[in-house]
Each structure stands twice: as structure tokens, then as C-alpha cells.
Amino acid sequence: MNIEDAVKHLHIPHELNEFIGDYYKALVKRADIDLLGESEFRCFARFLEMYASSRYQFADKAMRRLFQFLHMLIYIDEDGKPRHLELYPVQKFIMCGIFGLRTPDGGYVVNTANLYMARRNGKSFLLSGVLHYLMGMSKFRNELIVLASCKGQNATICFNEFTKFIENDPYLAETFSNVNKTACWAKNKNTGNRLDMFRTGGGAKNSLDGYTNKVAVIDEEMLCDEIIPKTIQDGQAHFKDSLLVTMSTAQFSVGSDNHKKWLTLRKMLYEDALLDNVFLFLAEPNLEELQAKEFGQITTWGKANPVLLFEADGFTVKKHIKEKYAQKARAACTEKGFALQSFVTKQCNAWYSAEDRSLCSYDQLKDCGVDYGMEEVITKGYIDWYLGVDLSQTLDLSSVVLLCFVGESKTGKLLKKNSPAARHRLFMHVMSWMPENKLQAHIEKDKFSYTDYVGTELFLCNGAGGDNIDTPQIFEQLDTLRKCQVFLGNSFDCQ
């Protein structure tokens, strides 16, 4: 797709110009300098198509009130001066995408909004503004608003931004009956809406179970267990009007459920298959740029930074940001490994896992396979083994890897220990343990026939009636193996 031509063929209705006209101008300018990605363009074009369909109305009065309200919010700038919040053109569009389109009876069209862009693009800052609108200005009344966050010690970042607006404005503070910064909750006395923050780790699902909340916001969704959004939406399912807003940046867990969700949303965007009640904003490099791994080019990482890279007009490139991040990009591309992984995921908003050249790939590992097993190795006299043990307390799998050096002939035949050998190689045997009651669930979820390995490489635990890993059972099995096969553990590493 020629983005530069396609964006110029879009038509902005006159009645929408005051709300998204600046964003459209920014898109045209960014396309001219190759800093507009196809995904972001498609998100905007889809919004225009939905409006043009005449199925929905645009709530111009409500959106004017929303922008007027957000403009009244006060923040402290880098120089320590109080300033009223000014939204970037792209942020105005996001607000219109979430709240602007209404059904004929006045209800919100969107009940799920997914916002994906690079780090340092004001996502948490914007969400804190969204929370203030939801708490005090939206149509919701006496509702529980869930803020789910999962960034470890930074879990309160969005809530802190929320409370800073209150601290900076005594008039806004008067609208709250209580703000508890320690327990992370607040209540608006005008609407009765209450905001509660949950950290999505450990027993978060249990904490959220049973909540029948209409409104929820998730900060850094792609760091959450995928069950968290599902649990929240379960609590919203029976409401006619509900809203879930999530924001995130790409991660490095390629192939995970969250990654699959990301890919599915993108695929549906490109196939025009997204439901009308889903608003997606996705700022990322184009596919061909990712495939070419041109991560050091500003025309790659710049497409994922619609706020960070530009001045308030949304298209004039900030010189100091361009220079700073160009330097970061060059350094990451030179260093590779985890440095490149960090830059690609955080600033290119692309899913990427570091390639460690000291490790082989899965296919290379398969090519190292031999036609003899552990029992034959022991029979040949190899009884000195290294054991690496990973005992899991939270996951459904514990594993032990057994390693020893063996000798082979030129044709790859296993030789007896201490025989003259053409080469020596590292023989590896892996044993894993899984709770008995979790086997079928993993077969269905992972689409992998674990049953083919039960009793040989995979052993089932009956701890807690088959629901948990039974560590003593693992040690007993290893001890039995030691006694029967007469092997010695030279190195035993419990991690």
C-alpha cells in the first residue's frame, strides 16, 4: 500500500474537522516523510468508514465537554510550572475513537479499546486523563472502575498520574470524597464512581473474580497474564454498557498468548474483520521494515512513536529526540542481543526475542539427535553425570536435565567409556514432571501430544490430589534412578 497517496484520498467530514482535523493534517505530513505506518493509517481509515456508514452518530457536544474537561486538568511541566493539559492530535483521535461514536439510543459503540504504541508516548498519562473523565464526566454512575496494572514496583504509575492531577487542582480535589494513595483507590462524590487499582500478579485473578464492574482500564496489558482481561470482561458480560480500555507496548515473549492476541487483532484490522465495538490503535513499523530488521532507521522506529518524536502539532520532528534515539538505535543494533531486544520491543513496538549466538536453535538442536538413549549410555559405563534442576513453585512443569560426555566412532557409534574415540560429544537427557490433573488442559491449550512422552520423559505428579507439582516425588524418582542405574551426580544445581 502506498500510504502517502492513500492518506491524501481520505475525506474528513466537516462536522469532525474540529476534533480530528489536526490529526489528519499530521498524518499527511508524517506520510510525506515516511513516518506513518500502515497499521496506524488503517486504524484512522476504519474510524472514518464507521462514521460514514451512518450506523452511528458522533457525539459532538459530549466530545467538546470531554476536551474542555481534559484541558482543565493541571500538570507540572519539566520547569516546575503548572500547565493545563493539551492533547496531541493523535490523543484527540484516540479519545474520539473510544468515546465519540454512539448508537442511536446514545450508548457508547466501543466497549473494548486496545491502544498499542512505543514507550514514552504518554500512554499512562493519557489513561490517567481517561480515568478522570470516566470518574467525573462520563455517563457512568455509582460504578466500580478497575485499574489493573502489572509493572512490578512501577505498578502504581498510572494511579500516581491520576492523583497528581488532583493534587495540582483544589477544585478537582473537591469533587472527590476520598483518595487513598496507599491502598490505591479513590471515590468521586458527584458521580459515586469508585476507582480501585489491582496489581495483576499472584492472586490477582482471585481478587477480580466476582466483580461485576462496568468499567476497567489495564496499564501494560501485554505484561499481564492473559487471564486478567478475560476475568475482567467476564465481570462486564451482562452489562449493556461496559468499557475496557487497555494500553501496552510489544514484549519479547514471542509465541505467547498475548503475542497471539496482538497478531489476531492486527490480522483482523487488515482484513476489515474487527467488530464495531472494538477500537484498535496500533502504531508500529511496516511489516517489510520488520522483516528487513531495519531497526536503526528513524523511518522504522519513528512510526511507533506518534507522540514522543513530534512537537505539539503532531508532525514536526523534535530534533533532540531524533538525535537521542538514533544514537540508541545505532548502539542497540551494534550490540545486538538483549540491548537490541529492549530497543525493538520498547521503541519499535515490535515483538522481538534476542538471538543469543552462543545457543543453537531448536532445529539445530534436533539435528544433534542420536539413535541411542540414556540406558545404553549408562550400559557403556558412563556413570558421571551433571544434573541441572529447575523446580517450579508456580508453573505446571519442573524439569531435570542430565548431561555427560560420551565417546563416538567416526560413524557416530557409541563407544565404551575410556575407549579411543574419534570425537566426544555432550549427551543430554531431559525428564519433566507435571501435575496429573493438568495434563489434558495443556494438551488442549498447547496443541501438543504430551501423552506420547508420559512414562519416558514426562512424569505425572499427584501432589494435592494431582493439582500441584510434588517435589519430594521428583527427588525420590531421581534417587531411585541413581540406585538402579548407578550414576553419580557431580553437579546438582537447584534453581
Residue ranges with predicted function:
Residues 2-389, 480-484:
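Phosphate/NTP-binding elements of NTP-utilizing enzymes
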Residues 121, 490-495:
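Acidic, metal-coordinating catalytic cores used for nucleic-acid/nucleotide bond scission
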Residues 128-136, 395-411:
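Acidic, metal-ligating active-site segments
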Residues 159, 213, 229-233, 257-264, ...:
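Composition- and surface-driven signal marking solvent-exposed, interaction-prone regions
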Residues 187-191, 404-488:
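Nucleic-acid-processing active sites and adjacent nucleic-acid-binding tracks
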Residues 365, 432-434, 495:
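Active/binding-pocket-proximal capping segment
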Residues 391-393:
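Non-cytosolic beta-sheet module surface loops
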